[in-house]
Amino acid sequence: MSNISNEAVILIKDVKPGSKNLNIVFIVLEIGRVTKTKDGHEVRSCRVADKSGSIAISVWDELGSLIQPGDIIRLTRGYASIWKGCLTLYTGRGGDLQKIGEFCMVYSEVPNFSEPNPELLAQANQQNKTSKEQRGNSPPNQNAGNGTVPVFSNNNAAPVPRDPNFGASGRPNGRAPGNGPPPVTAGGTPAPPKPTVSISNGRDPRRASKR
C-alpha cells in the first residue's frame, strides 16, 4: 500500500491517448454487457467518473465480474488508448484495480471523455502516417545511392585479373601471357629434350665403335 500511496493520482480530464502508468481514483457508474473474445476471455466496458468527468474502462475476466455500480476503485499502472474512435482506459499487464470504498465520492458525469471524438482519431491517424513515412523514405534513398555504383564497378574489375592468373599459375611455362597454346607446347616439350641430350652425349660411343 505504501507504493500505491506514493504514486501520483491524476484526474480523468488529464487522460490522453497513449498515456501510460496512470493512477486514477473513480466511482463505477455503469457496467456494460459482457463480450467474449476468440480466446474465451470476458470483457466488460464500464463507465466510471470522478469530479472532472467520466470515461469508459475495459475490464477483463474476473475483475469485471467483481465490480459493481457505486464501487470506488483505484486504478494503478493503467493506460489509455483510442478504440473505435473513443478514448478508453485499460488496466494493462502490470495494472491493478482495488476497491477502496462505496458511494461516498464527489463525481461528475459530464463531460464524457469517451464520446466519439473525430479530432482525436484524426490526430492519431496523422501520427501513424508521419511515423510510417519517415521510416519508409529514409532507407530506400540510402540503399539506392550506395548500392548501385560500387556493385557494378567491383564486378567488372574482378574477373579481369583472375583469368590470366589462374591460367599462368597452372604450369611453369604460363608466364608468357600472350601464348594461346601453352598447354600444347608444355605437353610436347618433354619428348624432344630427351633425344637432344642423348645425341650430344652419343659422339663418344660412335668414335669408339669405329675404332
UniProtKB/Swiss-Prot annotation:
Residues of the region (Disordered) are 125-211
Q: Where is the composition biased (Pro residues)?
A: 179-195
Query: Is the Disulfide bond keyword given for this protein?
Result: no
GO terms for cellular component: nucleus; SOSS complex
For molecular function, the Gene Ontology terms on record are: DNA binding; single-stranded DNA binding
Q: Which CDD domains has this protein been placed in?
A: SoSSB_OBF
The record's comment on protein family reads: Belongs to the SOSS-B family. SOSS-B2 subfamily.
Q: How does it assemble?
A: Component of the SOSS complex, composed of soss-b (soss-b1/nabp2 or soss-b2/nabp1), soss-a/ints3 and soss-c/inip. SOSS complexes containing soss-b1/nabp2 are more abundant than complexes containing soss-b2/nabp1.
Describe its function.
Component of the SOSS complex, a multiprotein complex that functions downstream of the MRN complex to promote DNA repair and G2/M checkpoint. In the SOSS complex, acts as a sensor of single-stranded DNA that binds to single-stranded DNA. The SOSS complex associates with DNA lesions and influences diverse endpoints in the cellular DNA damage response including cell-cycle checkpoint activation, recombinational repair and maintenance of genomic stability. Required for efficient homologous recombination-dependent repair of double-strand breaks (DSBs).
Task: Spell out the PANTHER family in the cross-references.
Answer: OB FOLD NUCLEIC ACID BINDING PROTEIN-RELATED, SOSS COMPLEX SUBUNIT B2
Name of the featured protein: SOSS complex subunit B2
- The source organism is Danio rerio (Zebrafish)
Gene name in the database record: nabp1
